[in-house]
């Protein structure tokens, strides 16, 4: 996990991201890397029904995030929640673009819809964790970078800003989510380097250095330390492993990056 201006990982609070884990900073680290490290905190995303309950149990330095939001303020969209509702219950973060929203639920959310949600959430004053990643056939076909680049480009097309500030990127290879498979540390680092390079080339070098990039694909206690050792893995977007006592081991694995 890197230090940015907000928290990170599965729990989040009013100006900080969900479950973020720290980032290793070598003895001589860049100004952006140092900034990322100094601003990291802990956070987590909770189902909407349990937000108040979760907030009541946590210390103030833990941030709580919603898991999704709709694309606008209102309308006939039964079952959806708006960014304004999220803010109204005291949250400062929302997760957008998770693979299950993109590929599993209903007709799925395409790149344009996910990006529109990010823009709307930002305009409402929320920080965003934006998930990107490729499916198995795209990984096998060698199009991982092209797929991720299109997902990132949609943000700029929608007028999204905040790279290095209230926008966190979470790389989650779809083929590794809930499957027991996991990208190797080298594969995770490679993807994170590509994302950081993309931001440098399309936004700015400063934004690239300051942007937190999490890894989320069957991250668990058994691989957390190896992932933490990668210089561009700034934190973890943890799913199933966050429901077990071993979750604390994932947190401890990233203490080297504080």
List the predicted regions and their residue ranges.
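Active-site loop-to-helix "anion-binding N-cap" substructures in soluble metabolic enzymes
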Residues: 1-258
């Amino acid at each position: 996990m890197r230090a940015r201006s907000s928290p990170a990982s599965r729990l989040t609070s009013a100006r900080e991201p969900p479950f973020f884990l720290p980032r290793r900073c070598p003895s001589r680290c860049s100004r952006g890397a140092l900034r990322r490290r100094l601003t990291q905190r802990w956070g987590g995303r909770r189902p909407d029904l349990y937000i108040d309950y979760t907030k009541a149990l946590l210390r103030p330095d833990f941030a709580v995030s919603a898991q999704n939001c709709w694309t606008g303020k209102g309308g006939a969209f039964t079952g959806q929640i708006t960014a304004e509702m999220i803010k109204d219950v005291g949250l400062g973060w929302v997760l957008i673009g998770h693979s299950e929203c993109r590929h599993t639920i209903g007709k799925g959310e395409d790149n344009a819809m996910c990006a529109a949600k990010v823009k709307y959430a930002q305009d409402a004053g929320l920080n965003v964790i934006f998930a990107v990643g490729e499916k198995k056939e795209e990984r096998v076909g060698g199009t991982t970078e092209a797929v991720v680049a299109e997902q990132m480009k949609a943000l700029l097309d929608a007028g999204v800003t905040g790279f290095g500030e209230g926008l966190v990127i979470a790389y989650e290879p779809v083929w590794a989510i809930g499957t027991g498979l996991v990208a190797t540390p080298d594969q995770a680092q490679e993807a994170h380097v590509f994302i950081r390079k993309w931001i440098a080339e399309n936004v700015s070098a400063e934004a690239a250095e300051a942007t937190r990039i999490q890894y989320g694909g069957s991250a668990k206690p058994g691989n957390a330390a190896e992932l933490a050792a990668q210089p561009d893995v700034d934190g973890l977007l943890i799913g199933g492993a966050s429901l077990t006592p071993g979750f604390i081991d994932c947190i401890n694995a990233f203490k080297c990056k504080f």
